[in-house]
């Protein structure tokens, strides 16, 4: 990811910040925010396994704990032995919040952009979930491809009507991967679309969050997706109370992809919280 940050934005000490993207996304997704962060910050934005430019493991599905191990290894290589700042979106936010509880000594501050977790599951859902997973394995995962990068950009704008054409054109350069037949596939392993056979165990997640020692900024969007309705429920507020040093913010005029919709607002929150 390019680091064309504001040349005049040398506010505060230099620092290293890791930018962690979400599910079916790529690290370049943070470019619009990165352009607005201080020029003396070092920004490191890896692609999760099976996304973007990262390799696809020889497996038929992905296991969430592997992302924790990947993050642990990346930090050991790029920032050994020091607490780091994490800015993470959606799935990346879920990984980062768990990591901050499992390795509390490694995270100084965390900005979580809509990494809200999932609604609580019930044990009675397990039989159908395993069956759904087996059926999906049998059918095999797939993602549609496109005849041009312009078509990829159009798909991105359909998914997010707030996305500007110039933003979509930029993202399509990173999301659209040229194939031997001249078509363009999305930069994500289709196996990521397989349902997780393991239910979301909110009690386990909450216990991990209790061990977070970092300052945490929890950022939601004004126009969250329908499946985010559960964050307004008392049970979810109780869940968040497990995080001891928690601040909250809402980005007005933005949907789930807030770092595309309102990059200026998101960059301001990040800069003020981490500085």
Description of each model-found segment:
Residues 211-254:
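Conserved loop-alpha-helix segment in the C-terminal half of the alpha/beta-hydrolase fold
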Residues 113-146:
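A catalytic-pocket lid/entrance helix-loop region that shapes and gates access to the active site
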